[in-house]
A protein has these predicted regions:
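Canonical positions in the second alpha-helix
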Residues: 10-11, 43-44, 77-78, 111, ...
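Helix-start (N-cap) detector for alpha-helical repeat units in TPR-like alpha-solenoids
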Residues: 17-19, 51-53, 85-86, 119-120, ...
Length: 186
């Protein structure tokens, strides 16, 4: 571990990449030195606060080490400090990985609505979660959120999304009803 730390420190000095703080912190964590690890993790997140362009690199480094809360905080700070950055997708998936499925659903649906070109990516991620959902708890939560959105906004987008969900659940009659309502509005 000491050799690894020396190597990481020398690489950090040569390249001045704050992503090495994540590696150094993880090395300390493996040595059961959580205080030292947290110190390095804080330095990595502080680097994002000072230079938001590092957010993706450092967020990914945290994700690769399964440090989900730190990754979420990194993306959040990067997005807050640079409004042109959008990490809503990554943050939504992290919420799902942390077990906050309802929050993930809301964030993914918001993201797909504001970035229509990414709807297919969002749907693919939702399918992955539905495949692991033997009791349909996740699918029912998704359906509930989509039904609320179709009632609140009357936007065809939500009817199309709901139709997609029904097709994935092999509820073709319900999907057909959604498609008919879309057709009548056009």
């Amino acid at each position: 571990f000491d050799k690894a730390e020396k190597l990481l420190l020398s690489k950090k000095e040569k390249s001045n990449q704050p992503g090495f703080f994540v590696e150094l912190g993880y090395n300390a964590q493996l040595q059961k030195n959580q205080a030292k690890a947290d110190s390095y993790y804080k330095k990595a997140i502080d680097a994002v606060a000072n230079q938001p362009n590092y957010a993706y690199q450092i967020g990914q480094a945290f994700e690769q080490k399964s440090l989900l809360q730190q990754a979420y905080n990194t993306y959040e700070i990067g997005q807050k400090n640079n409004s042109s950055m959008n990490f809503d997708y990554q943050m939504a998936l992290l919420q799902g990985q942390m077990g906050n499925l309802d929050v993930m659903v809301v964030k993914l649906l918001d993201y797909s609505y504001s970035n229509v070109n990414s709807t297919l990516n969002v749907q693919n991620q939702l399918v992955l979660f539905m495949q692991d959902d033997a009791e349909n708890v996740f699918a029912n939560s998704l359906k509930k959120e989509l039904l609320l959105r179709t009632q609140k906004t009357q936007d065809i987008y939500w009817n199309q999304f709901l139709s997609w969900l029904y097709v994935n659940q092999k509820e073709y009659n319900k999907a057909f009803i959604q498609e008919k309502s879309i057709y009548k509005r056009n």
